[in-house]
Amino acid sequence: MSTIWVVLIAIAALVAGVALGFFIARKYMMSYLKKNPPINEQMLRTLMMQMGQKPSQKKINQMMRAMNNQSGKE
């Protein structure tokens, strides 16, 4: 009878650990994305205007493609 209890407690601890780990990881990722949002076209356009460049759609698309290619290699 005690072996069954050990197995049940081990399974319960495993399930609780997985659930707790999921929620901790989810909270961490949400706070990380809130602090460091991914760059979109509007942010890139604003950045180029602040640097004194005229942001054409061709330049925006080129830079977005370059950033996506760079992030895909990592």
UniProtKB/Swiss-Prot annotation:
List, alphabetically, the GO terms of the cellular component aspect: plasma membrane
Task: Name one matching Pfam family.
Answer: UPF0154
> Any transmembrane segments, and where?
4-24
Q: What coarse category fits the chief subcellular location reported for this protein?
A: membrane
Keywords linked to the UniProt accession: Membrane, Transmembrane, Transmembrane helix
Where, subcellularly, is it found? Membrane
Q: How is this protein situated with respect to the membrane?
A: Single-pass membrane protein
> InterPro entries given for it?
UPF0154
Q: Which family does it belong to?
A: Belongs to the UPF0154 family.
* Identification of the protein by name: UPF0154 protein OB1676
Q: Which organism is it from?
A: Oceanobacillus iheyensis (strain DSM 14371 / CIP 107618 / JCM 11309 / KCTC 3954 / HTE831)
For this protein's source organism, the top of the classification is: Bacteria, Bacillati, Bacillota, Bacilli, Bacillales
